[in-house]
């Protein structure tokens, strides 16, 4: 926590997407003016555990098991892995952008530690939470993959008939 407060006091923007509780208090003048904490509470217990560091378009991305809870960092081995492929970085950024824009399942933390749920706007796109959108994207990818696999089956059968009949 202290390192994030020091970063905020030095003018570094710190954005935290969390699942549940957070000991850091955002928006305290002179301490955490540059810290934003948003909790995403949807159908899934797990959260993305994506870490992005950088500014000015020079971002480094990591994925990992760590969720930065003190008891877990002190009593377990946690790992972060750098993401180096441009396409993977873009995918991670899309996930982060989706979560920051969530108007259904997102709760903004205030300096007193209380949370206030965001209210969806009239825009139909805000009616779905980020987790629901990610589920739809995964299902869409699965359908595309199944379609590609099923296209190959008749060709293989025809080829097999020609070779073995």
Model-found features: residue ranges?
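PLD/PLD-like phosphodiesterase catalytic module centered on the HKD motif
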Residues: 1-165
């Amino acid at each position: 926590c202290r390192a994030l407060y020091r970063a905020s006091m030095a003018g570094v923007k710190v954005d935290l997407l969390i699942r549940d509780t957070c000991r850091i208090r955002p928006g305290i003048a002179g301490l955490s003016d540059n810290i934003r904490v948003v909790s995403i509470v949807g159908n899934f217990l797990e959260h993305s555990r994506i870490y992005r560091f950088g500014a000015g378009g020079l971002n480094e991305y990591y994925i990992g098991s760590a969720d930065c809870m003190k008891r877990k960092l002190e009593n377990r081995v946690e790992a972060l892995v750098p993401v180096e492929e441009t396409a993977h970085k873009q995918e991670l950024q899309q996930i982060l952008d989706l979560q920051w824009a969530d108007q259904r399942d997102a709760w903004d933390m205030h300096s007193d530690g209380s949370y206030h749920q965001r209210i969806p706007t009239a825009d139909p796109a805000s009616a779905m939470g980020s987790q629901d959108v990610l589920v739809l994207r995964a299902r869409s990818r699965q359908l595309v993959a199944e379609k590609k696999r099923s296209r190959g089956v008749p060709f293989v059968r025809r080829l097999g008939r020609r070779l073995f009949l």
